[in-house]
Amino acid sequence: MTKKVTVLGSTGSIGTQSLDVIRAQEYSVFGLAAHSNVELLLRQVQEFHPHCIAVVDDAAADRAARELHGMPGAPVLLRGKEGLEELAAMDGSDIVLNAVVGIAGLAATLSAIKSGRDVALANKESLVTGGH
């Protein structure tokens, strides 16, 4: 059975490397998230056809909405930090890979865990600040 993966931070170095592995292993991409690199995110959308994407930065989310408008099979667009957390918790994904830089990734990690998703961490802050 093909695992469905959500990659948070898909436009960063770790995120793009993760997508290289996903591509080679024939995993399915359920969701992608970026802070503001809409150009790369949209290229990833064209290749991986995710069900949903999240863009944290407001201006970048507006640009993504314009670019996605009228696109056949366009993914659902979530916005802001809340959108990132919603994507992390969304049903349909088997694994959430968190490659978000810094403390910004903690809330998304917690959302994924609370919703029962398997979490792959490339975000040490989630361990350092979220642990006891």
Positions of the model-derived regions?
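Rossmann-fold NAD(P)-binding glycine/threonine-rich loop
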Residues: 64, 103-115, 124-132
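A short hydrophobic/small-residue beta-strand
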Residues: 118-119
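N-terminal glycine-/serine-/threonine-rich beta1-alpha1-beta2 phosphate-ribose binding loop
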Residues: 1-103
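Short beta->alpha connector loops at strand-helix junctions that form conserved
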Residues: 56-57, 122-124
